[in-house]
Amino acid sequence: MIRNSIKSISDYPKPGILFRDVTSLMEDPEAYRATMQVLIERYSNTGITKVIGTEARGFLFGAPLALELGVGFVPVRKPGKLPREVISESYELEYGKDILEIHVDAIVEGDKVLLVDDLLATGGTIEATTKLARRLGGVVEDAAFVINLPDIGGAERLKGIGLNVFSICDFDGH
């Protein structure tokens, strides 16, 4: 049910790309609930103290997961979107660089942090997010995704920085 609710859009956002649209999953309340239940069952009673969601679709899965786990939710955002003092981390995109930010007081030394995003492709966003959380003293060992595109290699990249990678659905291609 979860996999079948994710629509594939050809040539979006550019020719040659087959885009996996997780918003179609969220339009189906049974599929969305089933997705959240998989994450809740996997991460209940694991000692997680904070869930970080990356802008923007990571919020849609990370925040309800944190609520169900009874832990804090921490948004990681693009520059200028967070009101309190932040630290930043730049990372490489396919064509250029981007920056992510986190509040300096969102993670405390020893927090066991779970990273959540909708889709894993190159792993650059989650690698930068891992660096931010670790700089603040967080213990980051796990990253969870609704969708993984294994042909792109992000899971291997994240395993290389010490993360356990979990995804609900793997899709071939780019």
UniProtKB/Swiss-Prot annotation:
Record keywords: Cytoplasm, Glycosyltransferase, Purine salvage, Transferase
Q: What is its EC number?
A: 2.4.2.7
A matching Pfam family: Pribosyltran
- The regions listed as transmembrane in this protein's record are none
Q: In terms of one coarse class, where is the protein primarily found?
A: cytoplasm
Q: Which InterPro entries match?
A: Ade_phspho_trans, Adenine_PRTase, PRibTrfase_dom, PRTase-like
A single GO CC term, please? cytosol
Look up keyword Transmembrane helix and say if it applies.
no
Q: What role is this protein assigned?
A: Catalyzes a salvage reaction resulting in the formation of AMP, that is energically less costly than de novo synthesis.
Name this protein carries in UniProt: Adenine phosphoribosyltransferase
Classification lineage: Bacteria, Pseudomonadati, Pseudomonadota, Gammaproteobacteria, Vibrionales
Q: Which gene encodes it?
A: apt
